[in-house]
Amino acid sequence: MKPSIVAKLEALHERHEEVQALLGDAGIIADQDRFRALSREYAQLSDVSRCFTDWQQVQDDIETAQMMLDDPEMREMAQEELREAKEKSEQLEQQLQVLLLPKDPDDERNAFLEVRAGTGGDEAALFAGDLFRMYSRYAEARRWRVEIMSMSEGEHGGYKEIIAKISGDGVYGRLKFESGGHRVQRVPATESQGRIHTSACTVAVMPELPEAELPDINPADLRIDTFRSSGAGGQHVNTTDSAIRITHLPTGIVVECQDERSQHKNKAKALSVLGARIHAAETAKRQQAEASTRRNLLGSGDRSDRNRTYNFPQGRVTDHRINLTLYRLDETMEGKLDMLIEPIVQEHLADLLAALSEQE
């Protein structure tokens, strides 16, 4: 391993021990914000510190085995120990490389999930409803909280558009690769000839930013319209103009929120979603510029990408980005998404490692 990498690992290991000592300080414990921040840092450093300690121990084992090679009686055993220690050293070095990859600062944050019906009319709206249910089930299994921010229901069920905030540990990091195009192939309930129709939805996942990190938005750049909320089937319709539509004039981004009965609450929700959308657009633009200099298989979050096809007649789901096909559609639609998400995450890590080696 390069001396520069070893030096970096030593510094991180020392910082881990320093943070551990700070967490036992009475003054730090009394300051809850500082204590929480240090606890997060300690958790983030723990894996790399533990792995580096194991690597150091293996280097000692290699040195000891090499010294034993000079002893004729110990040589055979020393050769076996040396082989095992070198294999373990290689494995630990690979783990440390992954642990040293730059972390996406947004990965641990809550996220806004948008599902929009695309081509396919009523069937696309129904599929948007199925997708939202799928993500809700996944969130429930991970003990995340789902809060609907805004929705526009389809005429025959499902959603033309639905926006929700998902809160919990590592939400954005887990869901960010869901952004993109999702296509469904199935026979609609209204289809008398049994023909398979293709419909599509787009999904966007954006991190929820703390107020201090939201993009600066000039109030003069906003057009705010109020209107009456429309309830499903004519029920619970507000008689006041509590619904809010905010248009960000420079980008053309439009956000509506009518979930709350209070105009003030709807405006606050709409502004938080608007900030996340502007941030996502800026991030995508920056990533596109970076990707032009090297191969970037994943991570662009470009909504025009075709992520997956869900084929109901065949019970098949295909992720086109990594050529993965599973005949486990029923489980997928029930929210068992790790079998699809984990391979994407691993491919992304491999892509980052390849980029890192290119830089070196």
Curated annotation (Swiss-Prot):
Database matches in Pfam families: PCRF, RF-1
UniProt GO MF annotations: translation release factor activity, codon specific
Main localization of the protein described in the UniProt heading: cytoplasm
Keyword Transmembrane helix carried by entry: no
Entry comment on modification after translation: Methylated by PrmC. Methylation increases the termination efficiency of RF1.
Protein purpose: Peptide chain release factor 1 directs the termination of translation in response to the peptide chain termination codons UAG and UAA.
Protein name: Peptide chain release factor 1
